[in-house]
């Protein structure tokens, strides 16, 4: 027997200050009544054959976003329900020079998520950026 009394997932953004609004930054996200949680491993600019990109930061950001979208959609989840996005990069300065690509993607897909950006010494092979997400439904 199945219970047909489904509750709708609720997502609440917590922003106690105003400064983060101009940066597409969210201080916290509260989620209630979830049906499932998807923990997405770090997605990078690796092609369908498993080859790591040696392209510039801008190109790798675009490819990493495409791969992240593919995993999320293949899992039956929606981009707008990303609640956490961690960004790892080997160069914060290069990442922030191209950060508008990520901000525009977030706005276009109505994503409001908690985030952390970390500069790391290295990523796999020739990769310079990695996107790790948590998605709910």
Identify what each model region corresponds to:
Residues 1-66, 70-83, 89-137:
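N-terminal presequence-like segments and the immediate start of the first folded domain
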